[in-house]
């Protein structure tokens, strides 16, 4: 370039920059002030109430809410009437308490409309195209994306391929794996018993290991040992994420850090191990040697059929990367959900021995001292009532959020694009207007005639979601919980330890913050 042309080029660059500055400023003013205030006016015109929007360039409000939540969780509460919502769901609880059920709260620059009306909830769950999930947090790629995060045609394709893995006939073949893993845990507990046949055990870590072992066996079968290594890496990834989640620096995930580097290394290890297992299985499948008696085998077989049915379409089946994401999701969803369900069940049955006795009597009537079988599990009415009630009081997830990408009518509301709707599962499950004056108490009797009768036909009970996107693994989780609970009731009676501190908290699921110490008595 000629030296004389250099000043001209510099002036061109400076002119472009100077012209871009006012455009950028206008964009930021609109994003940070004009648009939020416009959305707020629209919501107030609909009769919704909430705090006024305030411009905040830091995370002071989120930090304040987190502080309130941490202070609340620093003290234990009683189990007789457990109103856990103020402790673990501070923003929604305070908003509803202050403004009523027709209200909204702010999450950054986006207003979040709190939906508690069963008819509106039904509409949100059913119209999955109109109410998609919000955009992924950048950290999600380090844990799992998979089915729960996909939308539209991609979600429909993955759901179709995954569904066969969770058909009841397939799950029936996995019952021996459930029983085997549970018997191993029971043997460990029996080894801890004193001479009088009792011991105190924090059952929470044992139940986490149990459900991890079950997923390893049922997801990978013959590749169980390799699967267990992958799940150990996923556990380490989860711990790394927990140390990073409190980083409040804006755009933190765009900056280099030790935590981010460690998570990338773990992700590479997970990917390499999973890819090795999948490649071997795919090779065996093509040669006709593969079995489909575990989740991965069924998934690959279903994917193979999908690809074979439309060989000319690149989008027919799942890629290897997508199969890996679904395998990670099997672990995260299957392990955490069932472990938490079993922990809360033992806590509540330890507190309510009359229900424990009724459940044990039923289990012994149906199975005696034999291993639970598929046919008998369907006859466990009391056990099912107990599990439903535990899931009502302690659902795995405490809320669901959906985003509006276009103006929509929801019931009598006209909601503009840019708004989010939040379904506060925990608040609805504990609502005295729906469940009666004992809504915060443990009373499985409310489910004596099933869910439809208990809810009066309303959409107000959804521990696994509802509608087309209801959790594909709910039958897996409930079958596993029934088998484990049946085996425990056959072998032990148990009570809540005096050292137990009741502090529900959310990590990936709603779980006991300080564990679940239980006193076991051998039967």
Swiss-Prot record:
Protein location: Membrane
Catalytic function, reaction form: 11-oxo-beta-amyrin + 3 reduced [NADPH--hemoprotein reductase] + 3 O2 = glycyrrhetinate + 3 oxidized [NADPH--hemoprotein reductase] + 4 H2O + 4 H(+); 11-oxo-beta-amyrin + reduced [NADPH--hemoprotein reductase] + O2 = 30-hydroxy-11-oxo-beta-amyrin + oxidized [NADPH--hemoprotein reductase] + H2O + H(+); 30-hydroxy-11-oxo-beta-amyrin + reduced [NADPH--hemoprotein reductase] + O2 = glycyrrhetaldehyde + oxidized [NADPH--hemoprotein reductase] + 2 H2O + H(+); glycyrrhetaldehyde + reduced [NADPH--hemoprotein reductase] + O2 = glycyrrhetinate + oxidized [NADPH--hemoprotein reductase] + H2O + 2 H(+)
EC number: 1.14.14.115
GO molecular function annotations of the record: 11-oxo-beta-amyrin 30-oxidase activity; heme binding; iron ion binding; oxidoreductase activity, acting on paired donors, with incorporation or reduction of molecular oxygen, NAD(P)H as one donor, and incorporation of one atom of oxygen
UniProt: heme binding residues: 471
Cofactor(s) listed: heme
InterPro entries: Cyt_P450, Cyt_P450_CS, Cyt_P450_E_grp-I, Cyt_P450_sf, Cytochrome_P450_Monooxygen
Record Pfam families: p450
Expressing tissues: Expressed in roots, stolons and stems. Not detected in leaves.
CDD domains, per the entry: CYP72
Annotated transmembrane regions: 9-29
Record's bilayer topology term: Single-pass membrane protein
Biotechnology (record note): Saccharomyces cerevisiae expressing Glycyrrhiza uralensis CYP88D6 and CYP72A154, combined with the expression of Arabidopsis thaliana beta-amyrin synthase (beta-AS) and NADPH-cytochrome P450 reductase, accumulates glycyrrhetinic acid (GA) and, to lower levels, beta-amyrin; these GA production was increased in the presence of G.uralensis cytochrome b5 (GuCYB5).
Alphabetical UniProt keywords: Heme, Iron, Membrane, Metal-binding, Monooxygenase, Oxidoreductase, Transmembrane, Transmembrane helix
UniProt GO BP: 11-oxo-beta-amyrin catabolic process; glycyrrhetinate biosynthetic process
The protein's enzyme class: oxidoreductase
Reported function: Involved in the biosynthesis of Glycyrrhetinic acid (GA), a natural product which exhibits anti-inflammatory activity. Involved in the biosynthesis of the triterpenoid saponin glycyrrhizin.
Family: Belongs to the cytochrome P450 family.
Name assigned to this protein: 11-oxo-beta-amyrin 30-oxidase
Higher taxonomy: Eukaryota, Viridiplantae, Streptophyta, Embryophyta, Tracheophyta
């Amino acid at each position: 370039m000629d030296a004389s042309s250099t000043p001209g080029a510099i002036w061109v660059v400076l002119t472009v920059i100077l012209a871009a500055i006012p455009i950028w400023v206008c964009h930021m003013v609109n994003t940070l002030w004009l648009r939020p205030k416009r959305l707020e006016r629209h919501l107030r015109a609909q009769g919704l109430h909430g705090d006024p929007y305030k411009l905040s360039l830091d995370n002071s409000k989120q930090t304040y809410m987190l502080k309130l939540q941490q202070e609340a969780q620093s003290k234990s509460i009683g189990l007789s009437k457990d109103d856990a919502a103020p402790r673990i769901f501070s923003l929604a609880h305070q908003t509803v308490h202050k403004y009523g059920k027709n209200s909204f709260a702010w999450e950054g620059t986006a207003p979040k409309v709190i939906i508690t009306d069963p008819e509106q909830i039904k509409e949100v769950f059913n119209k999955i195209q109109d109410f998609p999930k919000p955009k992924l947090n950048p950290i999600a790629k380090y844990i799992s994306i998979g089915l729960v995060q996909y939308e539209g045609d991609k979600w429909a394709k993955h759901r179709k391929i995954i569904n066969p893995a969770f058909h009841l006939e397939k799950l029936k073949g996995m019952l021996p794996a459930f029983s085997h893993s549970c018997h191993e845990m029971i043997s460990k507990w029996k080894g801890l018993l004193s001479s009088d046949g009792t011991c105190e055990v924090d059952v929470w870590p044992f139940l986490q290991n149990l459900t991890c072992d079950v997923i390893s066996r049922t997801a990978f079968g013959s590749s169980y040992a390799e699967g267990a290594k992958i799940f150990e890496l996923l556990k380490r990834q989860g711990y790394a994420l927990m140390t990073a989640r409190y980083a409040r620096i804006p755009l933190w995930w765009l900056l280099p850090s030790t935590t981010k580097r460690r998570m990338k290394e773990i992700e590479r290890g997970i990917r390499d191990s999973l890819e090795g297992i999948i490649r071997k299985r795919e090779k065996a499948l093509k040669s006709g040697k593969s079995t489909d008696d575990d989740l991965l085998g069924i998934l690959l077989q279903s994917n193979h059929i999908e690809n074979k049915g439309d060989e000319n379409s690149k989008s027919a089946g799942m890629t290897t990367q997508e199969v890996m994401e679904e395998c990670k999701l099997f672990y995260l969803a299957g392990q955490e959900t069932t472990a938490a369900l079993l922990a809360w069940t033992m806590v509540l049955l330890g507190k309510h021995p009359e229900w424990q006795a009724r459940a044990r009597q039923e289990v012994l009537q149906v199975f005696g001292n034999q291993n639970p079988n598929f046919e008998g599990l369907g006859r466990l009415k009391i056990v099912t009532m107990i599990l439903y009630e535990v899931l009502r009081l302690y659902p795995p997830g405490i809320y669901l959020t959906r985003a509006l990408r276009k103006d929509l009518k929801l019931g009598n509301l006209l909601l503009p694009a840019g708004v989010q709707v939040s379904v506060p599962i925990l608040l609805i499950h504990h609502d005295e207007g729906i469940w009666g004056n004992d809504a915060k108490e443990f009373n499985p009797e409310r489910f004596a005639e099933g869910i439809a009768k208990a809810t009066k036909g309303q959409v107000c009970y959804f521990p696994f979601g509802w509608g087309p996107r209801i959790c594909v693994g709910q039958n897996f989780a409930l079958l596993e919980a029934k088998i484990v609970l049946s085996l425990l009731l056959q072998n032990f009676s148990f009570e809540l330890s005096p050292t137990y501190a009741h502090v529900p908290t959310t990590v990936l699921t709603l779980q006991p913050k300080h564990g679940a110490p239980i006193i076991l008595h051998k039967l």
